[in-house]
Amino acid sequence: MSAPAAAPAKVLPSRSDFDEKEKEKDVRTSNIVAARAVADAIRTSLGPKGMDKMIISPNNEVLISNDGATILQNLELRHPAAKMLAELAKAQDIEAGDGTTSVCVIAGSLLGAVSQLMAKGIHPSIISEAFNLALNKSLEVLVSMSVPVSLTDRVSLVKSATTSLNSKVVSQYTNLASIAVDAVLSVINPATAVNVNLKDIKLIKKLGGTIEDTELVQGLVFDQTASHTAGGPTRIQNAKIGLIQFCLSAPKTYMDNNIVVSDYSKMDKVIKEEPKLILEMCRKIQKSGCNVLLVQKSILRDAVNDLSLHYLAKLKILVIKDIERDDIEFICNTIGCQPVANIDSFTADKLGKADLVEEVGTSDGKIVKVTGIPNPGKTVTVLCRGSNKLVLDEAERSLHDALCVIRSLVKKKFLIAGGGAPEIEVSQQVTAFSKTLTGITSYCVRAYAEALEIIPYTLAENAGLHPISIVTELRNKHAQGEINSGINVRKGAITNILQENVVQPLLVSTSALTLATETVVMLLKIDDIATAR
C-alpha cells in the first residue's frame, strides 16, 4: 500500500514584509502626530480673540506674540515633521506676510482627515491625488468670491491692514494701518506696481512714548546721536551730506613694523605728523561743501577718533558715526549721495542734499532726523515707539505683517471676506463637487472639504462662542447664497463680513490653502525616516 501524498507546503508571508508595512504605518503616524501637536499648540492664537504666547529663550529673554511664524521660529522643535510645519509658517510669511497661524491650523486639520482616511485602509497615493483635485477646486471658488481693488482706493487698503492688525496686541491703535498703507504707497507707482520691495521701508525702534506716537517720516531717521565732541553742531539747515567708508584717523600699515627714533626732534616730528594728516583730511571734506558727515562703522578700529571729531566740530560739520554697512544702500537711495571709500574721491558731486538735519530728543535718548530732501528716492522711514521692549518688538512685527498685507494686494489686486466666510464657502462647494466624483476619490475630497471648517470653528471657539452652533448657522447662511456671511467675533454673531469691513487679500487665502495642502501631501508620501551619516 502506497504512502499518502504529502500536503503542499503553505507559504507564509515573511516576517520582514510584515515589519516593513508596520514601519511605514508607524512613520506616517509619527509624522502626523508631531505635526498636529504643533498645529494644536498655536491654534488658540488664531483670530482677533486669540491668545498670546510667552516664549522664554535659553538666556531668559522673554518674547510675547501671537504671530504663528514668530512663535514657531522661536520654539525648540526636534521632530522633523514638526520642523516642516515651522517651515510652512515661514513660507506663508514670506509669500503673503499674514495667515501664518491659519496655514498651520489648516495643515493640522487636513492631517487629521488623512489619519482617518488611512485608518479605513485608503492608500496615501489616492489621498494625495484627491487632495490636489480638491485644492484646484478650492482655488477656483476663492477667486470667484474675490472682489477687485484699486491701489488708489486707500480706504479699502486701510481696511485690509486693519483686519491683519485686529489679532495683534496693538489692535487698539488705529494709526498703524494708515501708516502701513501710506508707507507702501510712498515707495511704489500705484498705476504700474506689481510688487513692493519692503527694504525700501525702514523700521526704526525707539523706546519711550506709546504706540500712538509711531510716525511715518518722509526722509531718514538715525538711531545714532550726533557727535558732541568739542561742541559740534546738532542742527544744520541746507545740509550737504557726505557718506564715507574709510577711517578718519592715521593710516595703519598692513604689516607690523617699528620706527626707530634717534633724537627728540624726530620724535616731535612723528607726533605732529598725525594731527597734520587728520586736519588735511578734514579740510578736504569741508572744501567739497559737506556740512553733514556720515561715517560707516569699522570693525577694525574706531572709524573716527577724538582728534578728527574735534577738527570737524571746529569746521562746523555735523558728524553721525557708526552707520551700519547694511544701511548704506538705503541711505544712498534716500538722499542721493554716493559712498566714498577714499579721501581723494570726496567731491561735491558725491554729496546728498536735505533742507534740515537735526538732533531730536526723545524720552529714551536722542535721534537724528533728515527731512526736506529735494529729490527723494522711493523710500520712507517708520519710527516705532513703545513703552517697553516687549511692546515695541510686537509693534514692529505687527507693522511688518500689515506692510506684507498691502504688498499682497499689490501682487494680486483682489480682496476677499474674512471671518471664516471663504473657508465655509469653499467647504460647501467642494463637498458639492465631491458628489460629481465616484469611488474613493469622492470620499477623500469630501474629507478635505470638511477639514476646512476648522478655521470658523476655531475662530468661534477662541471668541468664547459655541462653535458647533455657530458653524451650523454659518453653513445654513451659505447654503442660502449668503457667501460673505462670516463670524463677527466683536459682536459674537454671524454678519455680512464685507459690510463689516473685515477683508483680507486673496493672496493670503490662496497661498495658505496651497502651501498647507502641499505640506500635507509631502508628509503623506514619507514612509521612512533615515539618519544621515
UniProtKB/Swiss-Prot annotation:
Location of the protein in the cell: Cytoplasm
Listed Basic and acidic residues bias regions: 16-26
Region (Disordered): 1-26
Taxonomy of the source species: Eukaryota, Amoebozoa, Evosea, Eumycetozoa, Dictyostelia
Family: Belongs to the TCP-1 chaperonin family.
UniProt keyword Membrane present: no
Pfam family of the protein (one): Cpn60_TCP1
Primary role: Molecular chaperone; assists the folding of proteins upon ATP hydrolysis. Known to play a role, in vitro, in the folding of actin and tubulin.
GO cellular component, as recorded: chaperonin-containing T-complex
SUBUNIT field: Heterooligomeric complex of about 850 to 900 kDa that forms two stacked rings, 12 to 16 nm in diameter.
InterPro entries: Chap_CCT_delta (IPR012717), Chaperone_TCP-1 (IPR017998), Chaperonin_TCP-1_CS (IPR002194), Cpn60/GroEL/TCP-1 (IPR002423), GroEL-like_apical_dom_sf (IPR027409), GROEL-like_equatorial_sf (IPR027413), TCP-1-like_intermed_sf (IPR027410), TCP-1_chaperonin (IPR053374)
The species this protein was found in: Dictyostelium discoideum (Social amoeba)
GO molecular function terms noted in the UniProt entry: ATP binding; ATP hydrolysis activity; ATP-dependent protein folding chaperone; unfolded protein binding
Keywords carried by this UniProt record: ATP-binding, Chaperone, Cytoplasm, Nucleotide-binding
A biological process term (GO) from this entry: protein folding
Chief location bin: cytoplasm
Name of the protein in its database record: T-complex protein 1 subunit delta
